């Protein structure tokens, strides 16, 4: 499909278009921001991740679409090639969208793409999206923080670049959220148990978050390995006492609330 807003004189005149790094959100097309949807409807070309759905791409029927997917364990597009595609398309088109799953600034390789665009003096804007961690917490109705139980949250991934050690330090936080979990989350569970974390620690796994085939697994830490064997799609793993069911968590008393208010004051 040909783009509708391209400028044939851009390349010859040395003029670049503007590039938007847009967060597509966790998956469902209606979870993209209003600004993101408006820009998609105006885009000349959209370079999109592998996890972006057809329903999301239907928001930009006028645009040329280029798949530049990166999936763990699958054939992926090299990041240098993606960077070059962004620059080359900014030479051809006035409005270029780089559509990323979740939020561009969290495990989205945004730094590398921003550097490539800035090197060529190309104007760029980042449009945030709903990250998978927040969407998973919402869809499972499990807050990541809870007064008196969990005051800190860490987002991390065990996926590493070639040549890097695969022994990623596990953050020391009340609630752990592991992106791109899969096999790596099994190793995380084993290490946490070896470090003395209780086997009964609550775990919530969300597979295919916000999509029609979404699935939520509620497990214990010592059940995570067997639970993940059921999963085939992208998963996000949340670990910590805040993930216990509300029936298992005490209701905060007025006295506790007053004490916390005094401590804050």
Task: Enumerate the predicted regions with their spans.
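A contiguous loop/helix-start segment that scaffolds small-molecule binding in enzyme catalytic cores
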Residues: 2-9, 16-21, 91-96, 152, ...
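Short, well-ordered alpha-helical microsegments
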Residues: 53-56, 133, 163, 185-186
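Residue-level signal for well-ordered alpha-helical positions
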Residues: 59, 139-140, 191
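Short hydrophobic alpha-helical segments that form membrane-spanning helices or hydrophobic packing faces
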Residues: 34, 135-138, 188-189
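Short, acidic/turn-prone active-site loops that include or flank metal/cofactor-
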Residues: 26, 51-53, 69-76, 130-132, ...
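Class I S-adenosyl-L-methionine
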Residues: 1-127, 223, 230, 235
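Short hydrophobic/aromatic-enriched beta-strand-loop microsegments
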Residues: 64-70, 121-125, 144-151, 196-205
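Class I SAM-dependent methyltransferase SAM-binding "motif I" and its flanking Rossmann-like core
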Residues: 103-173, 215-218
